[in-house]
């Protein structure tokens, strides 16, 4: 597999294979460089990307289990952003064997919410919006600090059950204190609710 590469000039064509990346492009007003993604229009909550998917300027390329490699190749992306899970690595290796350049997006390994947010700076470096990315982090950090200052004087601190629901199977994935969402809840003065026997960052509960 290819583990290094060189891009001449500003990136104008990318494919992103994780939904968490999409918001970064939108926040940098750079959705126009996204030519393919792993989000269907009906499942997309990033307005500018949803519009791009609907008008055809960006296309759905499938997910790791059903990726359309021929479609991706036809888009001729300068770079493909992938996650760092084992399934993502397998997909990236296949794409790299076809001569496509993949960049691993490691935000999933961050334990702190601000650490995850700062990955927007990687996108900024690729699309020639470094300063805009840094400004975005600085401005949002200031807003977060304002909220946290107000939290300090709050008399009540909630308990929070944070979960995602699977539409393909009857269960809920409840987040634990090993997940980065705990940094959000605890910073805001809350306490995350989860089964104390849990050892991973989430635990599956059936309906």
Regions found by a protein language model. Give the residues of each.
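Short, structured coil segments at secondary-structure junctions
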Residues: 30, 98-100, 188-189
């Amino acid at each position: 597999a290819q583990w290094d590469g060189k891009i001449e000039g500003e990136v104008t064509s990318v494919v992103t294979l994780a939904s968490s990346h999409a918001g970064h492009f939108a926040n940098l007003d750079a959705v126009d460089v996204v030519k393919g993604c792993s989000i269907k229009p009906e499942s997309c909550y990033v307005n500018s990307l949803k519009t791009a998917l609907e008008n055809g300027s960006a296309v759905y390329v499938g997910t790791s289990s059903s990726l359309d490699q021929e479609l991706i190749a036809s888009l001729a992306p300068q770079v493909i952003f992938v996650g760092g899970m084992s399934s993502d690595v397998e997909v990236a290796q296949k794409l790299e064997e076809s001569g496509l350049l993949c960049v691993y997006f490691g935000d999933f390994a961050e334990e702190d919410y601000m650490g995850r947010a700062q990955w927007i700076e990687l996108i900024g470096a690729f699309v020639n919006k470094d300063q805009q990315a840094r400004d975005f982090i600085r401005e949002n950090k200031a807003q977060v600090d304002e909220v946290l200052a107000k939290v300090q004087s709050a008399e009540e601190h909630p308990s929070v059950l944070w979960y995602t629901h699977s539409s393909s199977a009857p269960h809920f994935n409840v987040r634990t204190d090993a997940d980065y969402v705990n940094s959000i809840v605890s910073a805001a003065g809350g306490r995350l609710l989860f089964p104390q026997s849990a050892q991973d960052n989430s635990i599956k509960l059936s309906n």
